[in-house]
């Protein structure tokens, strides 16, 4: 085998007369270098006789360059040169030699023997043509290089020992945990000792179920200790622990498992570090090479489902070696890995996320409010509660008062009628409930008149009416309708009808005119117009309300076939159209009222006529407008994360605001289904774009129709700028109809000094348009070189509003909009389709107007050993190249879920005395947490957070 070239030279001082003693060992280099071995030898004494007694011998040094082949016992002399030496220089070289001494391998011993024989031969007595000055300079240079390398490495090692402290070790513990909340479960909240005992009991229980004949297989170790989704990583931990026992195990007993468990759950940093080191050090030589780091990186990437990182493991292994092994030894030791982990915070600070340094001034104490008394706390809490809910409160109060007034009015009216003497309070209760039903059947249509609401959003009514809660109000009214039906129908069937049937002749005379003088039977009452329409309405509304519930509409209810068709959006959509029949029956039912003969007493049509006409007009407008807004599909792209990107032609006269949404219909799939999607293009763009996550049956069918037989791997938004989409193909696609745009909470983003935009997965789409609009306006401002200070007009759809905001509620100043965007996704591939947005911000956001924060939840949190190495590679690569290893942009991707309390606290510190608009699109569970944090921070700081959730 060939010896690699050495990166330095050594010299040996001895008398030529004595030759080379076989006992003298050649120094093997710890450095990784080439097959060139510079050896410094003492040559012949020039004039031994010239020296007087007691004088020093002037020695001559010879530098010999050899190439050795240990395999075939051959040696090649590549070069030879003389170098002058003095005693002081020789002593320096001897000092270097002493520091470099170490045990030789078999190969180095054979080299020494070869050199000994060779140097004794007469051929080595040849003198060279080099001058004494050149030899002297060469020696100085080689000695300086050697000393520099050794000094630098030793200094780094000494510095690492000096900087190691308890506090740094404690911080490092958070970055190297084999057992944490992901393995022990979130329910464990007690102290560690108690927690560890509880966890071991769970491990014991899993051992009993997984073991066979009292032995646990190596492949089941991960599941047993809680690393369910990281089988390969757990096996590597298993092998590392087994190597400590000098064993190669395939199965372990319960006692051995307990020993392994104690090691991986040890709270000592040194213990965890040693396990992590042993995982990489597969050959147990106390050194980690580039290949071993690569293998550990691939294990970590596999455990975190990062296929792209797995492909680039070799590149990132070289990056780690470059950082930890600057001397190019070819390996790293335990102390170097320890240094990397202990300096985790320094690496993280060295690699900052994009635009985080700009923005408001951090005032950690000045914006905090610390009420001293309970009264002050309650007053502040009440104040925030009123500010957050006063719009909802007055609307609900007016609604409840209207229902109460109508109920009491009818109750008192029928108490004065003769029928009250027959049926008593059952009649008054039923009629009072009926009156509230008329009101609610009218009001329930208004929140779904989207065109009307969109227009009202542009008026001053938006200041006092919570249009964002239209769907919630629709649901509340529906619940009131259900209660009204129950009271009205229940009292009639259980109380009124039996009293009529069982009334005495004297009592029946009082109400005989309502029944044409004939006492009805129960069958007569049920088969009359009132009974048939009433029962039919109860049945139809029950079906519609049930299938519109969250569990049925979102497919959370699992039913056997063919009943499974009763769940999902389609079932909700079609059964809701049964309410058309209900309204027709309601008019008929209200016409054939008992005990009401005059036309003005039959008021049902008066309640519902205006809302019904308005709703019918809106549906008619949708039908007409959709034909006018028929669009051409310009580009279809299937993006990572099952996201379908559609770029369509912009219909003539189609105007919208950032944050609004549209309804899409594909007649090829269904002529009746309309589905809402947020607009992701900016108002100033020439195209109209949406991004659709293929989850339901309609979106799956849309993807099939648009992508069948076509290669759609191009990531449009990731490879083209917002203002000009590249290579748009005019392809013969199915027809799409567009209805809208419709108002959404996000369109009011200009009302705030600061924005906090939070999107989960595909929930980022409502905010893409806002970010584009902010950047487009910023670009226009730079071009025009002017700063708009006029009040923002709500009637403008293509706003000239740039970075100015309306007058701040705190102090009257107009402040530049600062946007903090948090995107949380669990699909590593989803980052690809959002890359264009991040790259555009990198290019255009020179003012630091927008902060981007990406969170990838498929990666274990920063405290998990499975993500520790990935986190370090990410920080090193970002610090060196300025690019994130996951997103491919300057925006660094965070791991696991955000700590929302810290997010809100940070924004409150940066923006004291400001109003922050919090806009969220995602699942309801996170919405509750965000709303709570917004309320808490509004009470504790001078920053006010106003929370808004997207509803479709």
Curated annotation (Swiss-Prot):
InterPro entries named among the record's database cross-references: Cyt_b245_heavy_chain (IPR000778), EF-hand-dom_pair (IPR011992), EF_Hand_1_Ca_BS (IPR018247), EF_hand_dom (IPR002048), FAD-bd_8 (IPR013112), FAD-bd_FR_type (IPR017927), Fe3_Rdtase_TM_dom (IPR013130), Fe_red_NAD-bd_6 (IPR013121)
Domain FAD-binding FR-type: 626-748
One Gene Ontology term of the molecular function aspect: calcium ion binding
Extracellular side stretches: 414-475, 553-574, 622-750
One of the Pfam families matching this protein, by short name: Ferric_reduct
Places the protein is found: Membrane
Quaternary assembly: Monomer and homodimer.
Family note: Belongs to the RBOH (TC 5.B.1.3) family.
Its biological purpose: Calcium-dependent NADPH oxidase that generates superoxide.
Protein name as it appears in the record: Respiratory burst oxidase homolog protein E
Organism: Arabidopsis thaliana
Native organism taxonomy: Eukaryota, Viridiplantae, Streptophyta, Embryophyta, Tracheophyta
């Amino acid at each position: 085998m060939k010896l690699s070239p050495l990166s330095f030279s050594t010299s040996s001082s001895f008398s030529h007369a004595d030759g080379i003693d076989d006992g003298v060992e050649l120094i093997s280099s710890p450095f990784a270098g080439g097959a060139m071995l510079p050896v410094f030898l003492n040559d012949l004494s020039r004039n031994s006789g010239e020296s007087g007694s007691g004088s020093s011998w002037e020695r001559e040094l010879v530098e010999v360059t050899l190439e050795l082949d240990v395999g075939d016992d051959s040696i090649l002399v590549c070069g030879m040169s003389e170098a002058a030496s003095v005693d002081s220089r020789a002593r320096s070289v001897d000092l270097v030699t002493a520091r470099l001494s170490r045990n030789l391998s078999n190969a180095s011993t054979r080299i020494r023997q070869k050199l000994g024989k060779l140097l004794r031969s007469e051929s080595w007595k040849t003198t060279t043509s080099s001058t004494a000055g050149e030899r002297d300079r060469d020696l100085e240079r080689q000695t300086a290089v050697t000393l520099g390398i050794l000094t630098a490495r030793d200094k780094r090692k000494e510095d690492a020992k000096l900087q190691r402290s308890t506090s740094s070790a404690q911080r490092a513990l958070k970055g190297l945990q084999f057992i944490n909340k992901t393995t022990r479960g979130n329910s464990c909240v007690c102290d560690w000792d108690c927690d560890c005992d509880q966890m071991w009991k769970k491990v014991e229980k899993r051992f009993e179920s997984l073991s066979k004949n009292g032995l646990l297989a190596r492949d089941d170790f991960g599941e047993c200790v809680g690393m369910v989704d990281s089988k390969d990583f757990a096996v590597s931990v298993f092998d590392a622990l087994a190597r400590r026992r000098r064993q190669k195990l395939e199965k372990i007993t319960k006692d051995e498992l307990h020993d392994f468990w104690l090691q991986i759950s040890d709270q000592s940093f040194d213990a965890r570090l040693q396990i992590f080191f042993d995982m990489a050090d597969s050959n147990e030589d106390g050194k980690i090479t580039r290949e071993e780091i690569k293998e550990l990186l691939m294990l970590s990437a596999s455990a975190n489902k990062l296929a792209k990182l797995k492909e680039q493991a070799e590149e990132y292994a070289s990056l780690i070696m470059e950082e930890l092994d600057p001397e190019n030894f070819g390996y790293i030791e335990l102390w170097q890995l320890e240094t990397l982990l202990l300096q985790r915070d320094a690496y993280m600070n060295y690699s900052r996320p994009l635009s985080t340094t700009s923005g408001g001034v951090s005032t950690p104490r000045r914006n905090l409010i610390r009420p001293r008394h309970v009264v002050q706390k309650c007053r502040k809490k009440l104040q925030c509660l009123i500010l957050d809910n006063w719009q909802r409160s007055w609307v609900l109060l007016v609604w409840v008062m209207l229902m109460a007034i109508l109920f009491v009015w009818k109750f008192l009216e029928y108490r004065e009628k003769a029928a009250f003497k027959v049926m008593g309070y059952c009649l008054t209760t039923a009629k009072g409930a009926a009156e509230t039903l008329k009101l609610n059947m009218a009001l329930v249509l208004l929140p779904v008149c989207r065109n009307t609401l969109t227009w009202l959003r542009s008026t001053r009514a938006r200041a006092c009416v919570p249009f964002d809660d239209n769907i919630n109000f629709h649901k509340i009214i529906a619940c009131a309708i259900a209660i009204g039906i129950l009271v009205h129908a229940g009292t009639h069937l259980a109380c009124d009808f039996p009293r009529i049937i069982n009334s005495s002749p004297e009592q029946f005379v009082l109400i005989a005119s309502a029944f044409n003088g004939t006492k009805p039977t129960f069958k007569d009452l049920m088969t009359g117009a009132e009974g048939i329409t009433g029962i039919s309405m109860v049945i139809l509304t029950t079906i519609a309300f049930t299938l519109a519930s969250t569990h049925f509409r979102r497919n959370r209810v699992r039913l056997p076939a063919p009943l499974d068709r009763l769940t999902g959006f389609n079932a909700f959509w079609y059964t809701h159209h049964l309410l058309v029949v209900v309204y027709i029956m309601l008019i008929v039912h209200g016409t054939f009222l008992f005990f009401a003969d005059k036309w003005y007493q039959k008021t049902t049509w008066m309640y519902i006529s205006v809302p019904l006409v308005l709703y019918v007009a809106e549906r008619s407008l949708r039908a007409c407008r959709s034909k006018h807004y028929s669009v051409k599909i310009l580009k279809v792209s299937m993006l990572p994360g099952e996201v379908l990107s559609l770029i369509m032609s912009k219909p003539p006269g189609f105007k919208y605001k950032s944050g609004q949404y549209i309804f899409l219909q594909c007649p090829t799939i269904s002529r009746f289904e309309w589905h809402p999607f947020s607009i992701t293009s900016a108002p100033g763009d020439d195209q109209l774009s949406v991004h659709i996550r293929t989850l339901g049956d309609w979106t799956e069918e849309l993807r099939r129709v648009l992508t069948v037989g076509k290669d759609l791997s191009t990531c449009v938004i990731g490879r083209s700028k917002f203002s000009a989409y590249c290579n748009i193909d005019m392809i013969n696609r199915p027809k799409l109809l567009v209805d809208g745009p419709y108002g959404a909470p996000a369109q009011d983003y200009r009302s705030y000094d600061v924005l906090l935009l939070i999107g989960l997965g595909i929930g980022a789409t409502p905010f893409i348009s806002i970010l584009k609009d902010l950047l487009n306006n910023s670009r226009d401002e730079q071009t025009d070189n002017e700063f708009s200070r006029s009040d923002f007009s709500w009637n403008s759809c293509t706003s000239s509003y740039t970075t100015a905001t309306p007058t701040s509620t705190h102090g009257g100043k107009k402040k530049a909009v600062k946007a903090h965007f948090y995107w949380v996704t669990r699909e590593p591939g989803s980052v690809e389709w959002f890359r264009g947005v991040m790259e555009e911000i990198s290019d255009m956001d020179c003012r630091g107007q927008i902060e981007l924060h990406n969170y990838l939840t498929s990666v274990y949190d920063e405290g998990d050993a499975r993500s520790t190495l990935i986190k370090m590679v990410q920080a090193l690569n970002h610090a060196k190249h300025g690019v994130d290893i996951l997103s491919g942009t300057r925006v660094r991707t965070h791991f696991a879920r955000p700590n929302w309390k810290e997010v809100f606290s940070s924004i409150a510190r940066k923006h004291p005395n400001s109003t922050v608009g919090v806009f969220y699109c995602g699942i309801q569970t996170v919405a509750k947490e965000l709303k709570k944090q917004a309320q808490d921070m509004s009470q504790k700081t001078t920053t006010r957070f106003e929370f808004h959730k997207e509803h479709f």
